């Protein structure tokens, strides 16, 4: 059983954590994040640390305990250093370009796929087969990266598609002829 909920979240200097009812706000050098937290789990904000405590040990409360602690830790980490993901396009003629707040993917379909880049994220295209996604919210960075990857996920026979930078795609053997 995981006991991650009992670990203290360290709050570095220059980061401010505030709770107003169910809303928790974390302000730091890179920006501000707000998230709704359950009032079932009590949160003690002290000098440079935040502790979580649960009233009972039922399954729902135990799950919330660890989740809320992990969410707050990710918020603190995000406003201090941010999060980033890198995607690679593998395949002949697969290209990407960024025009303003639009990402244009040419990945083997008859028309290019256009995706709107969320306002809170920064997307850079250093070359035409690499996409760098960065932002302060771990969830938003991961969700947008997964959305882009889902446009053409890697296929198992040649490995063509959009993949995360360090993702390993297991190549399967094709059918053998008679």
From Swiss-Prot:
GO molecular function list: rRNA binding; structural constituent of ribosome
Pfam family, one: Ribosomal_L6
One GO term describing the cellular component: cytosolic large ribosomal subunit
Transferase found in the keyword field: no
Alphabetized UniProt keyword annotations: Ribonucleoprotein, Ribosomal protein, RNA-binding, rRNA-binding
Keyword Nucleotidyltransferase carried by entry: no
PROSITE patterns: RIBOSOMAL_L6_1 (PS00525)
GO biological process: cytoplasmic translation
Entries under InterPro entries matching the protein: Ribosomal_uL6-like (IPR000702), Ribosomal_uL6-like_a/b-dom_sf (IPR036789), Ribosomal_uL6_a/b-dom (IPR020040), Ribosomal_uL6_bac-type (IPR019906), Ribosomal_uL6_CS (IPR002358)
UniProt subunit comment: Part of the 50S ribosomal subunit.
Family membership noted in the UniProt record: Belongs to the universal ribosomal protein uL6 family.
Function: This protein binds to the 23S rRNA, and is important in its secondary structure. It is located near the subunit interface in the base of the L7/L12 stalk, and near the tRNA binding site of the peptidyltransferase center.
The protein's name: Large ribosomal subunit protein uL6
């Amino acid at each position: 059983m995981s006991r991650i909920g009992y670990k203290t979240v360290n709050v570095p200097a220059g980061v401010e954590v505030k709770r107003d009812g169910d809303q928790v706000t974390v302000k730091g050098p890179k920006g501000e994040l707000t998230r709704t937290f359950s009032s079932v789990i009590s949160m003690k904000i002290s000098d440079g640390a935040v502790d979580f405590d649960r009233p009972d040990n039922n399954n729902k409360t135990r799950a919330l305990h660890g989740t809320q602690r992990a969410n707050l830790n990710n918020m603190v980490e995000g406003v201090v250093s941010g999060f980033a993901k890198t995607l690679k396009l593998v395949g002949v003629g697969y290209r990407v370009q960024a025009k303003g707040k639009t990402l244009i993917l040419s990945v083997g379909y008859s028309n290019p796929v256009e995706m709107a880049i969320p306002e809170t994220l920064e997307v850079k295209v250093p070359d035409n087969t690499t996409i760098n996604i960065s932002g302060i919210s771990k969830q938003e960075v991961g969700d947008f990266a997964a959305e882009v990857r889902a446009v053409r996920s890697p296929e198992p026979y040649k490995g063509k598609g959009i993949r995360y930078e360090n993702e390993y795609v297991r190549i399967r053997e094709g059918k053998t002829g008679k």
